[in-house]
């Protein structure tokens, strides 16, 4: 399994300036609650961003709805546009949140069909060679 590391977009940027990993997936769109830093520092870099716990709302499996400061639709679309839809992967915060809600949140953005397909599975299939 891959190593899990928590860091800021600025820390990731420093690493990327030193090394060029073959494949790197950054959870939570590259920096949870640091969306502007992601836009400024990481978009366009040779990394993947996943959508887990980043956009929409979180409803835990026990039914409780928690209001977290997740990014709004304008910021999500700005990151996807600047970074490129080819490098964004759909993700959920499962098992802590409801997967169907995460799907509904992304579907609700009304992204162009090609962009939606890439994010919702085509990119992951290409990355994993399946």
Regions found by a protein language model. Name each.
Residues 17, 22, 48, 105-112:
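Short, electropositive alpha-helical surface patch
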Residues 31-32, 54-56, 95, 126:
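Residue-level marker for beta-strand->alpha-helix junctions and adjacent short loops that shape enzyme
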Residues 20-30, 48-59:
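Active-site core of metal-dependent hydrolases
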Residues 78, 82-87, 98-130:
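Mid-to-C-terminal alpha-helical segments outside catalytic/metal-binding sites
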Residues 27-29, 50-52, 83-100:
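Short acidic/histidine-rich active-site segments
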Residues 1-40:
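Divalent metal-binding pocket/active-site signature
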Residues 7-11, 34-44, 59-73, 96-108:
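Histidine/acidic-residue-rich catalytic or RNA/ligand-binding cores of hydrolases
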Residues 14-19, 38-46, 77-84:
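Acidic (Asp/Glu)-rich catalytic clusters
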């Amino acid at each position: 399994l891959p190593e899990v590391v928590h860091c800021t977009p600025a820390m990731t940027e420093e690493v990327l300036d030193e090394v060029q990993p073959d494949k790197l997936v950054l959870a939570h769109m590259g920096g949870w609650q640091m969306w502007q830093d992601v836009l400024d520092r990481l978009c366009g870099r040779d990394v993947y961003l996943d959508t887990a716990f980043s956009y929409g709302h979180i409803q835990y499996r026990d039914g409780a709805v928690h209001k977290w400061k997740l990014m709004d639709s304008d910021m999500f679309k700005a990151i996807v546009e600047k970074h490129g839809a080819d490098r964004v992967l759909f993700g959920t915060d499962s098992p802590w949140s409801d997967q169907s809600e995460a799907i509904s949140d992304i579907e609700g953005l009304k992204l162009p069909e090609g962009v939606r397909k890439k994010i919702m599975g085509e990119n992951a299939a290409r990355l994993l060679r399946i």
